[in-house]
Amino acid sequence: MSNREPSWRDGVLFGVLGMLGFSGTLVATRVAVHDFSPLAITSGRIVIAAVLAAMTLVILGKTKLPERRLLPGLISMGLGLAIGYPFFLALALEQVPAVHGAVVTGLAPAATAIIAVLRTGERPPLGFWIACAIGFSAVLFFAIDAGGGHLSLADGWLFLALLSLGWAYVEGGRVSAELGGTTALSWAMLFLAPFAAVPFVWSMTDVSLATVAWSSWAGFVYAGVVSMFLASVFWYRGLAAGGIARIGQINLLLPLAALLWSALLLGEEITTTAVVCAVVVFAAMVVCLKSRVRT
């Protein structure tokens, strides 16, 4: 049987698998915070992912340390993806349902694009900024409506999670261009693992393992195995096979998929406001990414 070059169809397949894996993060975190603290979830994700990363690097034969000049980018990628995003997300989901988080985090493509613009000096057209403003306004309206007329602390945590994720994607994209997505992710997790091990052990001392619900364990393991590692591996492979411009659009479906999982798995109510705002954000993010100028 001859080897076949990956096609754009492979890119779509892996991209969809990655997106679906990411979309379960909100539900998994919402369930896990019932028995685990945000610190335990965040540090535990890193420890689990680091074990998988070490195995992956050995299998791929990528055990040689990256060049020193790439370390700042790898560490920045890890800090945003493995610490900032999950920690702030867990803090938020202690207070609001996963549906709320799904709508707000729908702004992730805009956050990523804006950070990339600031980092690269791009000059996007007016349509880019208008689309971002519309998406932000829709999320702001939803958050104020859900908060009874005002923003909540959870909304602040969610916006910090967005900034962390956007920063991680931008920095990760820079180092992934040289190392490859899976290799970059693996080294980022390994570099952070020693710093995550102690907080993880310490945070678990307050957990009564015998009373932890199976659903909390499932959410905790999902966050480490799927959200932190496998989904990223599928996603980066999809980008490599199908191209960033084409496959990257698949992630726009993530908040809509997260809404669906929230209703199906948690039984959360999806209000008309949530659906309308999610659709507006989705449309705005499509325009945002389509109008962005690449340099």
Feature annotation, model-predicted:
Residues 53, 75, 115, 124-144, ...:
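Hydrophobic transmembrane alpha-helices of multi-pass small-molecule transport proteins
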Residues 42-44, 82, 86, 100-107, ...:
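Helix-helix packing/entry segments at the starts of transmembrane helices
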Residues 32, 41, 45, 92, ...:
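Hydrophobic/aromatic residues within transmembrane alpha-helices
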